[in-house]
Amino acid sequence: MSAAFDPSAYDAQLQAKVTRLRELLAPFGAPQPAVFDSPREHYRLRAEFRLWREDGQRHYAMFAPGEKHKAILIDDFPIASERINALMPRLKAAWQASDELSNRLFQVEFLTTLAGDAMVTMCYHRPLDDAWEVAARQLAEELGVSLIGRSKGKRLVIGRDYAVEKLDVAGRVFSYRQPEGAFTQPNGAVNQKMLSWAYDAIGERDDDLLELYCGNGNFTLPLATRVRQVLATEISKTSVNAALSNLSENAVDNVRLVRLSAEELTQALNEVRPFRRLEGIDLKSYAFGTVFVDPPRAGMDPDTCELTRRFERILYISCNPETLAQNISQLQDTHRIERCALFDQFPYTHHMESGVLLVRR
C-alpha cells in the first residue's frame, strides 16, 4: 500500500507510523521510540523503470500492483534523487536519437549516491554488439556516469560496476562500494541516521560483535570501530566481495567475514559440525557481548532467534515491525527492550524501518 506523493501530508503519515510501532512494542514495555524522519522529496537514491511504447516512442513507465498491462507514464519522479531526475530526460533524449541505444531496450535502472556518484543500467531483449558499445561509451561520457548494458547472459560495463557512497558516522566518513544489482539502502539520508543510531546504541565495548546478514558492510564498518573484534556472516557472494572491498578501503582490520547462513553458524557455534569456510577462525577466541541482526522482511526464523538469545545484547534493525514484534515475543522472557527507534526509509508508504536494543534481564 502506498499513499500519493504529498509532502504536506508527510507529518501526519509519519505520526501514524510512530503510533503503529508503539502499539506493536507496547506489550514488551518498550520506551518511547526515537523518530528519524526523511527528506520530503528527492530521498530515493535508486529507481527502476520499465519502458512503454506509445506514439512510436519509448517512455519511462511504472505499473500499479496487479495491473501489468496498464502503464503509468513517468516524466519526472520527485521521490527520486535530484541526480536521477536530471539524468532521466537526458537519457531518454539519447535513446530517442539513437537506434543502437533504443533497439529492444525494455528497462532502465538508476543508482545514485549522496556522494554524487551515478550508475545507469540499460536492459535489452537482444545481444549487445560493438556498435552499441560505441554509442554507450559516448553516452556515459556525456552523462558523467558508469553505464552497464545487460542482455540475456551478458553484461557490458563502461566505467565501474559499482557506485561509491560516503557516509558520515560520528565524525568519521566511511566509503562504500555499492555493486550493480546488489541490495543497498534506498534512502541515503535516513540510512546515515540509522547508522548513527546503531553506533550510539552499541556504545564503546571491550568485547566482540557477531553480525548476521552483513550485506556490503553497511553497518559493519562503523560498528567495528566500537568493539574489539567482529565476526560477520553473509551468504551472497556479491555482497561478500563488496564488504571485503569496503573493509579494505576503510582500513577496518578487526573484522572476519565468512559465507555462512545463520543455521550453519549455529551449528558451528554448537560444534555440531566443522566448516571449511571457518578454517583459520577460532570461534572460542571470541568474547561475544552483542549480536547484530538486520534480517529480511520475514524476520528471524525461530532457530536464529534462539541463537541470538545466548547473547547479552541484541541489536536488531528491522524492515518489518510485525515480524520484529514476533521475534521479540520469542525473546521477551530473557531480554527486555532498552531503546528503540523508527527510521522513515519509505515515506508515503506504510513500510517502516525500526531498531531495538535488547538486553538480558
From Swiss-Prot:
<dbReference type="InterPro" id="IPR010280">
    <property type="entry name" value="U5_MeTrfase_fam"/>
</dbReference>
<dbReference type="InterPro" id="IPR030390">
    <property type="entry name" value="MeTrfase_TrmA_AS"/>
</dbReference>
<feature type="binding site">
    <location>
        <position position="294"/>
    </location>
    <ligand>
        <name>S-adenosyl-L-methionine</name>
    </ligand>
</feature>
<dbReference type="GO" id="GO:0019843">
    <property type="term" value="F:rRNA binding"/>
</dbReference>
<comment type="similarity">
    <text>Belongs to the class I-like SAM-binding methyltransferase superfamily. RNA M5U methyltransferase family. TrmA subfamily.</text>
</comment>
<dbReference type="InterPro" id="IPR029063">
    <property type="entry name" value="SAM-dependent_MTases_sf"/>
</dbReference>
<feature type="active site" description="Nucleophile">
    <location>
        <position position="319"/>
    </location>
</feature>
<feature type="binding site">
    <location>
        <position position="218"/>
    </location>
    <ligand>
        <name>S-adenosyl-L-methionine</name>
    </ligand>
</feature>
<dbReference type="InterPro" id="IPR011869">
    <property type="entry name" value="TrmA_MeTrfase"/>
</dbReference>
<keyword id="KW-0949">S-adenosyl-L-methionine</keyword>
<feature type="binding site">
    <location>
        <position position="185"/>
    </location>
    <ligand>
        <name>S-adenosyl-L-methionine</name>
    </ligand>
</feature>
<feature type="active site" description="Proton acceptor">
    <location>
        <position position="353"/>
    </location>
</feature>
<dbReference type="GO" id="GO:0000049">
    <property type="term" value="F:tRNA binding"/>
</dbReference>
<dbReference type="GO" id="GO:0005829">
    <property type="term" value="C:cytosol"/>
</dbReference>
<protein>
    <recommendedName>
        <fullName>tRNA/tmRNA (uracil-C(5))-methyltransferase</fullName>
        <ecNumber>2.1.1.-</ecNumber>
        <ecNumber>2.1.1.35</ecNumber>
    </recommendedName>
</protein>
<comment type="function">
    <text>Dual-specificity methyltransferase that catalyzes the formation of 5-methyluridine at position 54 (m5U54) in all tRNAs, and that of position 341 (m5U341) in tmRNA (transfer-mRNA).</text>
</comment>
<dbReference type="Pfam" id="PF05958">
    <property type="entry name" value="tRNA_U5-meth_tr"/>
</dbReference>
<feature type="binding site">
    <location>
        <position position="234"/>
    </location>
    <ligand>
        <name>S-adenosyl-L-methionine</name>
    </ligand>
</feature>
<feature type="binding site">
    <location>
        <position position="213"/>
    </location>
    <ligand>
        <name>S-adenosyl-L-methionine</name>
    </ligand>
</feature>
<dbReference type="GO" id="GO:0030697">
    <property type="term" value="F:tRNA (uracil(54)-C5)-methyltransferase activity, S-adenosyl methionine-dependent"/>
</dbReference>
<dbReference type="InterPro" id="IPR030391">
    <property type="entry name" value="MeTrfase_TrmA_CS"/>
</dbReference>
<keyword id="KW-0808">Transferase</keyword>
<keyword id="KW-0819">tRNA processing</keyword>
<dbReference type="GO" id="GO:0030488">
    <property type="term" value="P:tRNA methylation"/>
</dbReference>
<keyword id="KW-0489">Methyltransferase</keyword>
